Amino acid sequence: LHVLVGGLGLGYTAREALRSERVARVDVVEFLPPVIDWLARGLVPLAAELQADARFAVTEGDVYQRLASPPAQRYDVILIDVDNSPDEQLGDANASFYTETGLTLAKQHLAENGVLAVWSYADSATFERALRRVFREVRVEPVHFENGVVGEAETNWLFFARG
């Protein structure tokens, strides 16, 4: 499987993808050069583990611009972990990804039966409707967990789409 990850962060999403023996390659697109520098200098907690895996690659760029452009290759899985939620983006330019048009462009980057997964801290009926207009199969999963930092239960959301 070939996996595209939007956003490096602390590297946990990439590491989880690399745990599968079925994964041949994980390409991470990170917008912020300092985050890539932290990885190179070993300041990201998973830096050594990620950099030791020959299947891992990180490039600087805007994953949303990449997904809006004609595909250079197709991915079996696209994991987006960039914005706070479809309704609360980190930058105004990101908003177009969450629309029917943006999702149609992103879908072109998926291999046949490929899966798009988007993390969010909040549910979004508007985004779910856009996904359902573009993809054959859509599933929205709440993820309940105890946030040890703030000492309370939280719910995040995963949006899955295929076909």
List where the protein language model places each region:
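Active-site beta-strand termini and strand-to-loop segments that position acidic
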Residues: A161-G163
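Generic structural signal for helix capping and beta-alpha/helix-loop junctions
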Residues: T126, N147-G148
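Active-site beta-loop-alpha junctions enriched in small/polar residues
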Residues: Y121-D123
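The AdoMet/dcAdoMet-binding core of the Class I SAM-like
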Residues: L1-E112, V118-W119, R129, R139, ...
